[in-house]
Amino acid sequence: VKKLHDSHQDYARWDDAVTGLYNVPDAEFVRSGYTDSTSTGIIFDTAFLIDETGKDLFALRDGATLATSSRAYFGAAFAHILKESDRPAGEYAVASGFFQTPDGIAAAVAGPVVPFSAGFPVPAGQKRMLVIAKHLTEAMVKNLGEEFVIADLKLAAPDFHAEQNVTLADP
């Protein structure tokens, strides 16, 4: 989740992101910065941009547009990370959680799109919240096990009993 937090800051606390995502989001900026990133899935595979009214301005998964809202995709607990990361205009914060999505378990991070440079203007009355997520696929969990030298690390059903385990719960 820490890598996702760090990546969120790279994609959201960025002068170019303010220019490209406020007002009407620039389609080419969205494609090159977010759609393409979800298509590779290296850093994140899902992204949503939400405006100050709670409307999704884009919804992306694996390089394609999602036909569902962020709230429907992540479920009721999603409101918690939006609230936790909500700050006054220009102030950066981030919150995260694990969610059961239609595509499986995902770690998601939410926070406002803000400038990196002091004094860089943010359009008055607007707010953009960027949400990025990475799904815990079997391949991804296997790679984590190899990276951290944890033999046989894998996802298991909730009723699977093992000597060593970590429970991921979506309240």
Descriptions of predicted regions:
Residues A107-V114, F120-L136, L168-P171:
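Short, hydrophobic beta-strand elements of compact beta-sandwich sensory domains
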